[in-house]
Every structure is written in C-alpha cells, then in structure tokens.
Amino acid sequence: MVSYTPTYVFKFLPTILNALPLTLWVIFLTVLLGSLLGAGLAWAQLNSASDGWVAFAKAYVFILRCTPPIVLLFMVFYGLPEFLTWWLHLDVDDWSRTVFVVVTMILLFAASISEVFKAAYLAVPKGQLEAGLSIGLTGFQTFVRILLPQAFKIALPNITTAILNLMKDAALAYTIGLVDVMGAGNLIISRNLGNYSLETYTAVALIYWGIALILSLVSHFMEYSLSKGNA
C-alpha cells in the first residue's frame, strides 16, 4: 500500500514554485507569438486572393492539429538543429531548451487559435461591415472599431480554452530536460529515489489548478465587462 504524507505536498511546493516563472514565460511567449501566426493563418483562409495561401493555411492547420504535442516537440528538438545546420550552417547546440519548447508550442497554438479566430470572425453579422463602410469608415477602421471587438467577445471563451490546453501541452517540456513546474517536480522525485511521487505530483497539480483558476476568473471578468459595456 502506498503511503501518503500531506505535509510533504507543502514541503515541496516552494521548490516547485521556483520554476513557475519559466512556465509562465513559455505560456506568455506562445500566446503572444502564436496568436500573431494564428491570425495570419485565419486571414489567409478568409481573405487571401491566392488559392495557394488558402491551401497552405488549411494544410498547416490540419497537419498541426493532428500531430501529438510530444511528437512535434521531439521533431523540433532533434530536427530543428539539423535543419539550421544544413540550411544556415548555424550551430544551435548551446541554445536553451526553452527555445525549442516555445517554437513547438507556437506551432501548435497557432493552428488551434487560427480556427478560433476564423469562427469568431464568421460569427459577426456581415451587415456590421456594410454599416461601417456606409458611415465613411475605411475597411481597416471598420474592422478595428466594429468587427474586432465583437469577434473578440465571441472568441473569448474559446481563447481561454486554447490557453488552458496550451498549459497542459507545455507540461511536456520536461521530456527534453526543461526544468519548468513539471520538470522541477520530476527532479524532486529523482532526488528522493522515487519516494513521495504522489505528494510531489499533488503539489504540481495544485500549481496548475491555480493557474487555470486565475485564467478562468480573468476570462469571466472580461466577458462580464464586455457584456456590461454592450448593454
């Protein structure tokens, strides 16, 4: 029978929390850069006059959404250095593992968030665009002032879900040696020769639950504020 000592959960928490900034940094960079790439993919599918760009965007989204995160992480970690050495004669052996994790997460997040952006844009009544143009706004002004706020409100719950999924995918970073929250937990288990594994993973779970709770509360607050502003 496996013994469980709750006090060790709180004993290990401070050590694991030291790795929290790295986890949050990976998530932040991925959301920022992945959203930019995702917006480009959504735009290519919605507004591109080139069939080639449309096909590329659709193929990208399909392939990346069908690729298991851990498979892509290993492909980037082992394949990107080989590719950069062959193409640019660039030695990346000294690069931080964080780079490979962020690149992987950006590729994955962009595929999922592009579908969120596309669906939200299509959900906005097309009469809004015509109304904006009819009062003298340019296409860009109409998009920024009228379409974007409405699309963001529609997309917000799915954006939150995408970020939560990203948080779970990013936990795989420990498999290539990155000492994030999950990696710190595994180091503790190794130092204790496999003992207190359940207590350690409980501490790790508490941190992820905390991140998810804060993110959900922020999302609900933003939804409430947007609904109140449109009331």
Task: Give short role names for the model-derived ranges.
Residues 1-231:
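Transmembrane alpha-helices and adjacent helix-loop boundaries
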